[in-house]
């Protein structure tokens, strides 16, 4: 991957709307160091949409939702990939790049969904529902993916379910994503009990209050939100779909019912749009910082490894998804 990296000084013009000067003065040393380290080490940084603007807009080479990062990870030709996101994303990057070094800056960057289910849980579901295909959300460990028939993201879940041509499908582990997909298809969806700790806190009452306070506001919801929230929203979709919606429709005022940094990152691209922010922070995503990205590149921390037997089966489930 080749690119001319701008200086950190010019980068501030891009993010000044969401990063005050006093904060920028704290970030700039790490940003300069990271830009230099990437060149020296032939490294790229993949950043999820929930990363803070100083990471997303200033040091990342590839950005996007889980599906976009999975697709783009396959095209990376650098020797080192730093995943600015949570652990399952780093594992997915490693699955798709087994011969590259994949680093995650903080091993504690987990996910409530990934922690809600184990490989043994999937095996028990298979015993309970024999011959029913298992669709596993990418927000899971490699061990869980290895027990699955195919993976999905919030951006392609409906297409994945339809691609199986089955009357019944097990969909793990996000209960609300499964219910929201079930509302769009005649396929019977058997759900698990996992929930995203960020999205489960949004309520339909939140939306009604927003509409009362901001008449005419456009409400966009993530499909990990409860079904009643999705029903109240003007649009529901993945973070990439939300970003595309804002770019296409240019609403005067909008609220994104998702993680806080998403609004900041989209606002950088659309200064003409007024973003209302009743968001929820993801404590796991916020464990990734400029400081630990810099340390990851300086000290080669933390290298992602996956058991080869698990990796082979998990890779198949992820790659099958990418061909849908």
Curated annotation (Swiss-Prot):
Keywords: 4Fe-4S, Cytoplasm, Iron, Iron-sulfur, Metal-binding, Pyridine nucleotide biosynthesis, Transferase. Transmembrane segments: none annotated. One of its GO terms (biological process) is 'de novo' NAD biosynthetic process from L-aspartate. It is found in: Cytoplasm. The keyword Endoplasmic reticulum does not apply. It catalyses: iminosuccinate + dihydroxyacetone phosphate = quinolinate + phosphate + 2 H2O + H(+). The keyword 4Fe-4S applies. GO terms for molecular function: 4 iron, 4 sulfur cluster binding; metal ion binding; quinolinate synthetase A activity. [4Fe-4S] cluster binds at residues 111, 196, 282. Its cofactor is [4Fe-4S] cluster. Its EC number is 2.5.1.72. Pathway: Cofactor biosynthesis; NAD(+) biosynthesis; quinolinate from iminoaspartate: step 1/1. GO terms for cellular component: cytosol. Its main location: cytoplasm. Iminosuccinate binds at residues 48, 66, 137-139, 154, 222-224, 239. Binds 1 [4Fe-4S] cluster per subunit. Belongs to the quinolinate synthase family. Type 2 subfamily. NCBIfam families: nadA, PRK09375.1-2, PRK09375.1-4. Catalyzes the condensation of iminoaspartate with dihydroxyacetone phosphate to form quinolinate. PANTHER family: QUINOLINATE SYNTHASE, CHLOROPLASTIC, QUINOLINATE SYNTHETASE A. This is Quinolinate synthase 1.
């Amino acid at each position: 991957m080749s690119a001319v990296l701008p200086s950190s000084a010019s980068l501030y013009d891009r993010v000044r709307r969401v990063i005050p000067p006093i904060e920028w003065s704290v970030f700039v040393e790490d940003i300069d160091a990271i830009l230099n380290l990437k060149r020296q080490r032939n490294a790229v940084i993949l950043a999820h949409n929930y990363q803070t603007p100083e990471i997303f807009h200033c040091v990342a080479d590839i950005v996007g939702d889980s599906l976009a990062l999975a697709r783009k990870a396959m095209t990376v030709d650098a020797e080192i990939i730093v995943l600015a996101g949570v652990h399952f994303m780093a594992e997915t990057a490693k699955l798709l790049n087994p011969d590259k070094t994949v680093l995650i800056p903080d091993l504690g960057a987990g996910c409530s969904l990934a922690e809600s289910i184990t490989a043994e849980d999937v095996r028990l579901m298979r015993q309970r529902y024999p011959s029913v295909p298992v669709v596993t959300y990418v927000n899971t460990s490699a061990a869980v993916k290895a027990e699955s028939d195919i993976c999905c993201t919030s951006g392609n879940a409906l297409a994945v379910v339809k691609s199986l041509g089955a009357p019944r499908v097990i969909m793990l582990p996000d209960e609300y994503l499964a219910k929201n997909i079930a509302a769009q298809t005649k396929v019977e969806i058997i759900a698990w009990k996992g929930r995203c700790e960020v999205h489960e806190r949004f309520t339909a009452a939140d939306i009604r209050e927003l509409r009362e306070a901001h008449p005419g506001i456009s409400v966009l919801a993530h499909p990990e939100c409860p079904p009643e929230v999705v029903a109240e929203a003007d649009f529901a979709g993945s973070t990439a779909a939300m970003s595309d919606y804002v770019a296409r429709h240019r609403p005067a005022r909008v609220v994104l019912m998702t993680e806080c940094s998403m609004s900041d990152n989209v606002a950088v691209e659309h200064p003409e749009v007024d973003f209302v922010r009743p968001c929820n922070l993801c404590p796991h995503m916020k464990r990734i910082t400029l400081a630990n990205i810099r340390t990851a590149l300086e000290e080669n921390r933390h290298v992602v490894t996956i058991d080869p037997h698990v990796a082979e089966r998990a890779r198949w489930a992820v790659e099958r998804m990418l061909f849908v």
